[in-house]
Amino acid sequence: MRNGLLQVLTVVCTSLVVGCAVPSAETQGLSTPDGALFLTIDLQVDPERVEEFLAVMLDAAPDTRAREGCRLFDIYVDQDNPGHVVFYEIWDSREQQEAYLGWRQETGFNARIGPYMVPGGGGLTYFNKVDG
């Protein structure tokens, strides 16, 4: 029952995330826009609490996407390890993304999602686009 519910939730979450992301003309291609910041946040979520975590994140996603500088915010779940969740984000600048993270900290959101995390798992990585 739990695995079936998780599979349904994963499909629904994937559909919602893709359906909610309204790309600008610049991000409709398959490439990160020049000058934009691309990052991933790699998380390990308690396998017993993945469904709850995704519900909280999907509820918060519209606020994230509405932040100044956010071009794209998607959530992905590992097909073979549902506790492995990755956020894929594109921002106009690192400063805007860091201001967003500060806002989430100030509002208590990070403390709210902390109990879902597996200690020592995850990380945030900023990437530069290499043209060539």
Regions found by a protein language model. Name each.
Residues 9, 21-23, 29-32, 62-71, ...:
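An amphipathic, aromatic/His-enriched active-site/gating alpha helix that lines ligand/cofactor pockets
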Residues 44-53:
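Short, surface-exposed ligand-recognition loops at beta-strand->loop->(often short) alpha-helix junctions
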Residues 76, 125-127:
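Solvent-exposed beta-strand sheet faces enriched in polar/charged residues
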Residues 1-10:
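Bacterial N-terminal signal peptides that target proteins for export
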